[in-house]
Amino acid sequence: MNCKLTGFNTCIAAATLLLCSSPLVHAADNCAGVDVLVTQTSETTEIAKNHTISIWKAFSVLSSPDSIYNNTTGECSGVILTTPDGKTQSMGYCARKDKDGDTHSISWHSAPGADKGMWKSTGGTGKFAGKQNSGWFQFAVGDGKMAVTNWGGTCQ
C-alpha cells in the first residue's frame, strides 16, 4: 500500500462531507449557515489504483447569524473512502464550543457519490444540552487547504 499526504482531492472530499450552510435554506430548515474549514492533517492510503482511504482533520468555524451555532469553533475529523468508480463516501464528527464555553458535537456522513451529506447532534453542554438537531451539508468552495460548506437543518 502506498501512503501519502494529499491536499486538494482529500480536502474537497472531506469538505463535501462536513457541514454548514448559507442562504441556501430549504423549506423545512429553521437554521442554516456556513462552515469554514482549515485542514490540519490529511493522509491518504492507496489500497489499489483509484481505491483510497483518507483520514482528515480540520479546524472549523461556524457562521450562522440567527442560530445558537453562530461563531462556534472547534475541530472536525473523518474518514473518506474513494472507490475505483470515482465515488466517495465519508463519515466523521465535529466538536465545537462557543464564547460562553458551552460545547456541542455532531456526527456527519455522506452516501457513495452523494451531492449532499447529513449531520445530527450527538451531545452538548449548556445551551446545546439535549438538542436533537439534524440537517444537511454541501461543499461550496475549496482550495485544498481551506474549504467552505453550506449547511441547513431543523434546530431547536
Regions found by a protein language model. Give the residues of each.
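Bacterial N-terminal signal peptides that target proteins for export
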Residues: 2-12
